[in-house]
A protein has these predicted regions:
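Conserved N-terminal beta1-alpha1 strand-loop-helix module at the mouth
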Residues: 1-88, 93-96, 103-106, 110-111, ...
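Glycine/threonine-rich flexible loop motifs
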Residues: 144
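Short gly/ser/thr-rich secondary-structure transition/capping motifs
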Residues: 114-118
Length: 144
């Protein structure tokens, strides 16, 4: 299995965002990782959908959108419309994870699931075959 490189733009300087995206476009990176935080599921707020739309216009790489938000299923159509290829939701934010994964796939994106550092990976045994990838956080979500 080939490792996938998906640099995050979480710590990018907005004044140089276009330049940073161009650098990623010229790199060997496979995807661009965009973290969207709502200040509810996680304590911080990050990019919103306008930034996702802007980055989608600039990049030649697939967009890996990581939603650290409550009720991510409400935003599936918007995330797809804004150009995401992979929609990554948190196990802890989705009481009906199977349904959310199915909705992401039906929208035409690759479903991915993230777990927090303290969440046992064994909790994913019933969903693992239904997702494109699993992201295991090495820090508590909301901090980069």
């Amino acid at each position: 299995m080939k490792p996938i490189i998906s640099p995050s733009i979480l710590s990018a300087d907005f004044a140089y965002l276009a330049k940073d995206i161009e650098m990623i476009n010229r790199s060997e990176a496979d995807w661009v990782h965009i973290d969207i935080m709502d200040g509810v599921f996680v304590p911080n707020i990050s990019f919103g959908f306008p930034v996702l739309k802007y980055v989608a216009k600039l990049t030649s790489k697939p967009l890996d959108v990581h939603l650290m938000i409550v009720n991510p299923e409400k935003f599936i159509p918007e995330v797809k419309a804004l150009g995401a290829h992979i929609m990554n939701v948190h196990y802890e934010a989705c009481p009906h994870l199977h349904r959310v994964v199915q909705q992401i796939r039906e929208a035409g994106m690759q479903p991915a699931v993230t777990i927090n550092p303290a969440t046992p990976i064994t909790l994913l045994q019933d969903i693992i075959r239904d997702v494109y990838m699993v992201l295991v956080m090495s820090v508590n979500p909301g901090f980069g």
